[in-house]
C-alpha cells in the first residue's frame, strides 16, 4: 500500500529534499510551506518525474496554530489517511 507523507517546510532545503526522496520511493505527498509558488513548482516537478503518485500542496504558516490543524485535516481528508508527518518548518 502506498504511504501518505505530510511534510511542513517543504518548499526548500531539507523539506524539499525529503519530498524528492519519498516521491522517488512511490509515496504520496502532502506538502506545505509559506511559499506556495515554490510548492507548486515542486509539485509539477515531482508529478512529472513520478506520475503514479499524488502530490498535494497548500500554503501554511506554522505560526498560525489553528491553520496547522485545518491544513493537516484537509490533507488527511483528501488522501484518506496520513502515515507520517514530518515537522520540518
Q: Would you name each region that the model predicts?
A:
Residues 9-13:
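Conserved glycine-rich cofactor-binding loop
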Residues 22:
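Aromatic pocket-lining residues of Rossmann-like dinucleotide-binding sites
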Residues 25-42:
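Conserved glycine-rich Rossmann-like NAD(P)H-binding loop of the short-chain dehydrogenase/reductase
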Residues 55-57:
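Hydrophobic/aromatic anchor residues within beta-strands of the central parallel beta-sheet
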Residues 59-70:
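The beta1-alpha1 cofactor-binding region of Rossmann-like NAD(H)/NADP(H)-dependent oxidoreductases
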Residues 83-84:
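Conserved catalytic-site loops of classical short-chain dehydrogenases/reductases
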Residues 88-89:
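Conserved NAD(P)H cofactor-binding loop of Rossmann-fold oxidoreductase domains
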